[in-house]
UniProtKB/Swiss-Prot annotation:
Region entry Disordered, spans: 181-209
GO terms, molecular function: rRNA binding; structural constituent of ribosome
Name of the gene this protein is made from: rplI
Compositional bias ranges of the Acidic residues kind: 197-209
Gene3D superfamilies: Ribosomal protein L9, C-terminal domain, Ribosomal protein L9, N-terminal domain
Cross-referenced PROSITE patterns: RIBOSOMAL_L9 (PS00651)
Name the UniProt record assigns to this protein: Large ribosomal subunit protein bL9
GO cellular component terms, A-Z: ribonucleoprotein complex; ribosome
Known role: Binds to the 23S rRNA.
Keywords: Ribonucleoprotein, Ribosomal protein, RNA-binding, rRNA-binding
Amino acid sequence: MKLVLLERVENLGVIGDVVSVRPGFARNFLLPQGKALRATEANMARFEVERELLEKRNAERAAEAAESGKTIDGESFVMIRQAGESGQLYGSVTSRDIAEIVSESGTKVVRSQIALNAPIKTLGLHELKIKLHADVSVTVTINIARSQDEAERQAAGEDVIAAQADEDRAIADAQAAELFEASEEGQELAAQREATEDAGADESEETEA
């Protein structure tokens, strides 16, 4: 399907370009969001008449997006989630979740603006882009942790999963050492008992003799 773009679309073209796209992409995204028109003679004539106005409006929207983006660009947002010891989440964090928490900061963001290829399923710091406008993107960090304390440790650069694994190994080593010591003590006591019993038996034999 041939369309004329009304704004820049990433990996497709800029305002005024006539492009060929799949019908589904046109009907489900470009046309309903007002990013393009069907490239008919009537629409092309209409576009040329309104081109200057469209370009001015697009520049204004880009400026507004850039201004609002200053409040979140480079910021970190904490999300507390349940997860196993391996760091795997019980569930996932989606673009909708991210849009909601970022919007709480005062900058309105919708899920379609979140550049996320797949839901996030692990703890940690996840850097991603938010496309506030075709010409304006900002970068944020999503800090997913099991507690506020863990989030602060991650923000400070600590690998909490590796730290937890080290702690678990240290505990396991300590428990193994305790068991080994207990086993050695048990063997010593058994040896002492055996020696005592042998000595008693020798004394008994001497008495009988």
